[in-house]
């Protein structure tokens, strides 16, 4: 069984309907809409298909919303669970391709496909485990050349994004995960209301299995950096980053260095 979930907060109906269309033309058996909005105006979408379950929830954050669906997926005996952003869409049944990849790579617990902008450009969402300089420097150090160079390293631009590779930190916009791994890790850490929760989850998954990037499958993402435009979102972003480093370590994080070095060596071997 394959389950999937999206968490919404006054999400564009157009985006959500487009995503639902992708889901219903795929091999996803059950799709959960966790609605954190201040009203349940999206409830009517449940009537589109019996494969859709709508859950109206208090807004406890992105990760906590997804945990509701993860618990349901575990109860249903799901084999794979997909975490999807509402502004994601794709062509064809890419889900079967991801299942085949996981079947062929039993040591992989999480896979992310290649994520593209609607115009076909690559989104650089494969990342190393971050240092404080990576996350704060890219935002607050006012030197464009420094930011670009640091980002290119942190976001692994040098990898080419054209080969299968193990990646320490993958984006939460589309995560294809073995449900038993989600059960072992306990899902998202509810302390992260918004931002950094995917980074934390991917890191915890990476401690017990491999987290992989699979560029043969393509997904489109209408990506917007909301915290760059909204002060309230910026506050959430900064708070989550602080919580992340309080949890894992700021400048002294031996596991971070070990994991990054391991993945860098693997990637260098693949490139050569």
Positions of PLM-derived features:
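Short, well-formed alpha-helical segments that are part of the catalytic scaffolds
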Residues: 11-25
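A conserved acidic beta->alpha catalytic loop
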Residues: 33-44
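Glycine-rich, basic loop-to-helix element that forms the pyrophosphate-binding segment
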Residues: 57-76
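Short beta-strand-to-loop acidic/aromatic patch adjacent to the donor-nucleotide binding site
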Residues: 78-89
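Conserved donor NDP-sugar-binding/catalytic core segment of glycosyltransferases
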Residues: 89-125
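Short, flexible, basic/aromatic active-site loop/helix in glycosyltransferases
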Residues: 130-167
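A short, conserved alpha-helix in the catalytic core of glycosyltransferases
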Residues: 159-162, 168-187, 191-218
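Active-site-adjacent helix/loop segment of glycosyltransferases
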Residues: 203, 207-272
């Amino acid at each position: 069984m394959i389950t999937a979930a999206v968490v919404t907060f006054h999400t564009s109906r157009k985006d959500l309907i487009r995503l639902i269309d992708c889901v219903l033309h795929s091999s996803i058996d059950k799709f959960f809409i966790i609605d954190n909005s201040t009203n349940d105006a999206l409830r009517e979408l449940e009537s589109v298909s019996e494969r859709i379950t709508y859950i109206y929830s208090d807004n406890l954050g992105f990760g906590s919303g997804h945990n509701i669906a993860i618990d349901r997926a575990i109860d249903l005996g799901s084999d794979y669970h997909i975490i999807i952003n509402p502004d994601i869409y794709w062509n064809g049944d890419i889900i079967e391709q991801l299942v085949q990849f996981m079947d062929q790579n039993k040591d992989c617990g999480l896979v992310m496909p290649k994520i593209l902008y609607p115009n076909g450009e690559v989104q650089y969402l494969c990342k190393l485990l971050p240092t404080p300089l990576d996350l704060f420097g890219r935002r607050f150090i006012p030197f464009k050349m420094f930011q670009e160079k640091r980002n290119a390293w942190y976001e692994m631009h040098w990898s080419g994004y054209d080969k299968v590779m193990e990646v320490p930190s993958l984006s939460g916009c589309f995560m294809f995960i073995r449900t038993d791994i989600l059960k072992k890790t306990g899902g998202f850490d509810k302390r992260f209301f918004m931002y950094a929760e995917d980074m934390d989850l991917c890191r915890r998954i990476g401690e017990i299995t491999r987290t992989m990037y699979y560029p043969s499958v393509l997904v489109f993402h209408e990506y917007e950096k909301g915290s760059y435009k909204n002060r309230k979102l910026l506050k959430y972003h900064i708070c989550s980053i602080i919580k992340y480093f309080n949890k894992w370590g700021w400048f002294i994080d031996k596991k971070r260095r070990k994991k990054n070095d391991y993945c860098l060596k693997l990637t260098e071997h693949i490139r050569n």
